[in-house]
From Swiss-Prot:
This is V-type proton ATPase catalytic subunit A isoform 2. The lineage of its organism: Eukaryota, Viridiplantae, Streptophyta, Embryophyta, Tracheophyta. It comes from the Eukaryota. Belongs to the ATPase alpha/beta chains family. V-ATPase is a heteromultimeric enzyme composed of a peripheral catalytic V1 complex (main components: subunits A, B, C, D, E, and F) attached to an integral membrane V0 proton pore complex (main component: the proteolipid protein). It is an enzyme of class 7 (translocase). Two separate genes encode the catalytic 70 kDa V-ATPase subunit in psilotum and equisetum.
Length: 30
């Protein structure tokens, strides 16, 4: 899925070393 540039830059590195976009993370948590 293509993520808009502003959101694409908002990535966080998970403890297991993966990078996950904040947008995806919010969807999983919600």
């Amino acid at each position: 899925a293509e993520v808009p540039m502003p959101l694409r830059q908002l990535t966080m590195t998970l403890p297991d070393g993966r990078e996950e976009s904040v947008m995806e993370r919010t969807t999983l948590v919600a």
